[in-house]
Amino acid sequence: MVARAMRAWAQDPNIELLGPLDAERIGVFALNIRSGSKKLHYGLVVALLNDLFGIQARGGCSCAGPYGHALLGIGDDDALRHQQEVRGGQSVLRPGWVRLGFNYFFDERTTDYIIEAVRFVAAHGAAFMSLYKVNPQSGVWAMSGAVRPKARPATLLEALAPDAALQQTGE
């Protein structure tokens, strides 16, 4: 599955795989998505993978420090500028990438689903930008006007099977 993802994503000009492409890999990928000459913010990519496909991914720099700077081509001057921006409350400007993984028990269908979801975001992610807002302080992207439930289910039974809970109460 790792080789399949690597082949598919390495051929896509909008997907930038980080790290040496010829090294042996476990099922974890670090990548960025391009839209034209610019990168989509890793936080937006993570939000799109979650909101559109239910895929959990992480965005950021993975506590990689100097290695992360090397992967992203960030020199000392840029690193200092980023540090000052983040300290000034602009966490959204923190450099980083998207990380996602393939578990050993994923079947081919799940593997293909993840591969194609990333390819979809690479092809169409920029079109969704107007539907999202970013909190500059936290760097978190959220769909604007997203509907949130007003109340949580009262019981686990209601959460897992609302119809069964209604039948038990006679409603």
Task: State what each model feature region is.
Residues 51-55, 59-78:
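Surface-exposed, low-hydrophobicity interaction/linker segments
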Residues 75-93:
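Surface-exposed acidic, glycine/proline-enriched linker/cap segments
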Residues 21-25, 50-51, 90-95, 106-109:
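A structural signal for short secondary-structure junctions
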Residues 49-57, 118-127:
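A common structural junction motif
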Residues 1-46, 58-67, 86-89, 129-171:
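Conserved small-domain helix->loop->beta segment predominantly found in fold-type I
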Residues 103:
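Glycine- and other small-residue-rich loops at beta-strand/loop junctions that grip anionic moieties
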Residues 1-4, 113-117:
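A non-catalytic, amphipathic alpha-helix used as a structural packing/dimerization or gating element
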